[in-house]
From Swiss-Prot:
Pfam families: EF-G_D2, EFG_C, EFG_III, EFG_IV, GTP_EFTU. The gene is fusA1. This is Elongation factor G 1. PROSITE patterns: G_TR_1, G_TR_2. Belongs to the TRAFAC class translation factor GTPase superfamily. Classic translation factor GTPase family. EF-G/EF-2 subfamily. GTP binds at residues 12-19, 76-80, 130-133. One of its GO terms (cellular component) is cytoplasm. It comes from Syntrophomonas wolfei subsp. wolfei (strain DSM 2245B / Goettingen). Gene3D superfamilies: 3.30.230.10, 3.30.70.240, Elongation Factor G (Translational Gtpase), domain 3 (3.30.70.870), P-loop containing nucleotide triphosphate hydrolases (3.40.50.300), Translation factors (2.40.30.10). Its main location: cytoplasm. One of its GO terms (biological process) is ribosome disassembly.
Amino acid sequence: MLKELRNIGIIAHIDAGKTTTTERILYYTGLTHKMGETHDGDSIMDFLPWEKERGITVASAATRCFWKGNTINIIDTPGHVDFTAEVERSLRILDGAVVIFCGKGGVEPQSETVWRQADKYQIPRIAYVNKMDAVGADFFRVIEQIKQRLGSNPLVISLPVFKEECFSGIIDLIKMKYYTFAGKLGNDIAEESIPSEYTETAEEWRSVLVEKLAETDETLLDLYYNNEEIDAGLLSRVIRTNTVSGNMVPVCCGSSYRNIGVQLLLDSIVDYLPSPLDLPGSKAVIMETTETINIMPDSQDAFSALVFKIINDRHVGRLAFARIYSGKLKAGTVVFNSSKNKRERVGRLLRIHAEHREEINEVAAGDIVAIIGLKDIGTGDTLCSENFPLLLETIDFPQPVIQIAIEPKNQAGLDKISEALNRISAEDPTFKISYNKETGQVLLAGMGELHLEIVAERLAREFKLDFNTGQPQVAYRETIGKSAEQVTRYVKQTGGKGQFAHVVLRLEPGEGFEFINRISQGSIPREYIPAVESGIKQALEEGVLKGYPVVNVKATLLDGSFHEVDSSEMAFRTAAFLATRECLKKAHPRMLEPVMRLEIVSPEEYTGNIINNITNRRGKLESLEMENHTQIIRGCVPLAELFGYSTVLRSLTQGRAGFSMEFSHYEERHLAS
């Protein structure tokens, strides 16, 4: 039943305890009989070799478990900024999220990033303050940070209890009960009266909870004003309504590593996060009419699904992970890839549990599945019924910001490296490949040094390739500053059939890449239009200034003509390519460089030195914030100025400061700078 289905993601800053929490969830729901640990390298969700060795999540991993009659599809995502695209693609297809915060670290830089991503997709969420056993953990400070830094409306539903300064249990503010988790693995849950020393605090926070909820529900408001007893079931229903609407974020606490509170978190997931039926549906465009409609999760409707992840499995080949939005999908049936205008036959359907697979025959609306057998498939593609072709909203990914050059140790290895890189780039939309024609080097572009380090490791270990790598470089981009038009007639006459294509093209500044066809009355036959778009895209792969990819361009095909005999797809592709190159020269080409958002945590006495250094690196200071005698400095600095910054910061602060950075935006860089 869809009502009992939850599609959720676990998202957080690195080391907040995402994978540890997921491992406990799998154990308590009976899916596993042993708790894996990231520090021991035996966690079920981090099953890739480089994840086990580093103790971090690199790729999002899916699993499915059951709790109190509900089915929970879980996607555990990376916390490292280099792999933020994994969070992006996961949130696009999920209905809810658990955002984990470290009880000591609170709202950290990547916490803010994943929160913004969840806001972008309007994902209802629960906050879980983890690591309450850590020295320096402060539950109420984290609540305040969630409110102030994230602009959220936190609703505290549980309180931590400490005995002799040790985290010992949790007060449930809805039931007004105290819970302890005994036994080595926290299996023995005891429900007790609230300890006397916590009674006053619990009653205060219970009043805050009821007051906030009463503002949104008349029945609750009447009971509250009349001092009548309030049923826990009513509170839960009102909390659910406010969570699903995004009005409030329930906050609970625990220590996953110490096995305290995870069962209560599971209760909150099924009680407060939405089922597919609770949400307004997913937008789609009907291809025939370009009308925008809402797709509801009805298994009786026409089939539609969005592919959100591709992996190459050594046992079964290419696996396409998809969220089913409507209808049903059966193994062996033919589907229509509306993003590529192609028919595809589905081979087998699999349920995924980390690296383990379970074959199924059918999947229905609202669920998540892995598909084997799709040949020409990419992340963000829509699969649908050929009788009702439509396009679901795709997934936006950030541009790569850093690149390295690699060279095979012998020429024979170049083809093997190219094949391996193409397989990796099919899996990872933020990983790009290009070739330097002058040096013969292969350039790999990604979101950060760790991202590219993992790619290089995969090439060596998974594909058994031998190569040299260069130093990291900035992945610059080019764009245009004004509109330009070009008329190009491509005519080539040889002994036999000639080539002819005539295009009138306009380029102007835009967002991303957009192609518009303004051809009317058949001056260019419809079958040649895709070739024109292909030629434009090919020309944008290398800019006219320094050969970097060109971004943020809107291309409009205004007019043209053809020859009945000599015109061909190749002729129009070539004409569009040449026209685009000429347009780029006339449209005030400009260089763009990636700018990073920097956060530095330092003792106060080094603030002046750090700010001066940021300014000297062409940086812009955004904010200063004091917290527990520690200065938090935030600003934006071009990536080109940040190579080796960790060494510089150590020198400036005698090793007492730390920093993190994430991609912010691209901005113009003058060639003289």
